[in-house]
Regions:
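Compositionally biased, low-complexity segments enriched in small residues
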Residues: 16, 24-25
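Compositionally biased, low-complexity flexible segments
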Residues: 1-19
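Active-site-adjacent structural elements that line small-molecule/cofactor binding pockets in enzymes
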Residues: 8, 21, 27-324
Length: 324
């Protein structure tokens, strides 16, 4: 049984006329114990798969500075380890209030028996600040990839059966298609789609309904020159356009073989990877909010030869996004 506060997720219902808030409050009853859980993500977060170290000061994380800029969450890749990466604890320790989320832990390698206790440990040290993102990964990356939906159901069952379960409100699914989106609404706080156009955000909201969290990742290029911006975007997109889960999802929105080949057509790149000056990129992020996203995970794609974290771009974008 799950009940939700205003704008909450799970089986609860938002209070009529209540203002929408950018957090989720869920209470799970499991084995006669109650787990009050919430994660405040804010409207915009940072998604990053590389080093969180400052280019200017290589021994210093940028997490505290991102928190001071107003970003509500820091999303980091979960990798393919059996447990949770130590990066999550390090980011939490370096900050005071910002949420930290995995985007994502692979259900094929992140064993529930390892992940669950690690989440509980983070909760004991940093109450209410860690969100577990779980995903099905991709057939080319997993040696024994079969029946991903059924495997995800079994994975969630295993998390629920732990001595210290991972509550529904503390987990999100990397959902793209309708079945996984429905599962995200029924068994998690919501969905964390990756590499999607704004049309997917609108459709995901219609599948999830008004309550569950919708937090898409959106990669951006802060570059006004079309040729240079699209070249950077294609370099980023090339890997994802070789993975069937992403290409099948893009086909749902009218993109064909000619769009997917060669690192992506201009039409596809422009739809999936917003580019332009800071104001233009900020407007494209707001389109996802207007389409139903509660929270957007912003991933800056920077040019070749750039070492360290692209803090300058995130600083500029924060000025535009936090202002409105």
């Amino acid at each position: 049984m799950a009940t939700a506060g205003p704008g909450g997720s799970g089986g609860g219902r938002a209070v009529a006329g209540a203002p929408k808030r950018w957090w989720r409050l869920v209470v799970i009853t499991h084995s006669h114990r109650r787990y009050p859980t919430y994660v405040d993500l804010g409207r915009v977060g940072v998604w990053w798969s590389g080093s969180w170290r400052s280019a200017a000061e290589p021994t210093v994380d940028v997490a505290a500075e991102l928190e001071s800029l107003g970003y509500g969450a820091l999303w980091s890749s979960g990798g393919f380890d059996p447990g949770l990466s130590p990066t999550f604890g390090r980011l939490l320790a370096a900050t005071t209030r910002v949420a930290v989320a995995s985007g994502i832990v692979s259900m094929w390698t992140g064993a529930p028996s390892e992940v669950g206790p690690a989440v509980a440990q983070l909760e004991s040290r940093f109450p209410g600040r860690f969100l577990l993102g779980i995903g099905a990964s991709h057939a080319p990356l997993v040696s024994d990839y079969a029946r991903p939906y059924s495997h995800m159901v079994a994975y969630l069952d295993a998390l629920d059966a732990l001595d210290t379960p991972v509550p529904m409100g503390r987990r999100v699914l990397a959902a793209l298609g309708p079945r996984m989106l429905e599962l995200a609404a029924q068994r998690a706080a919501g969905a964390h789609p990756y590499f999607v156009p704004v049309q997917h955000t609108a459709r995901a909201r219609s599948v999830l309904g008004p309550g569950p969290l919708l937090a898409p990742e959106v990669a951006v290029v802060v570059e006004s020159d079309p040729e240079a911006a699209r070249a950077l975007a294609r370099e980023y997109a090339r890997l994802y356009l070789e993975l069937p889960n992403y290409t099948e999802n893009l086909r749902r929105f009218g993109f064909g073989d000619e769009d997917i080949a060669g690192g992506g057509s201009d039409r596809l790149i422009d739809a999936v990877v917003p580019w332009g000056d800071v104001a233009t990129v900020a407007d494209r992020i707001r389109e996802h909010h207007d389409a139903g996203a509660d929270h957007v995970c912003l991933q800056v794609v920077s040019g070749p030869g750039r070492d360290g974290f692209p803090l300058a771009e995130y600083t500029e974008l924060a000025g535009a996004l936090m202002a409105g």
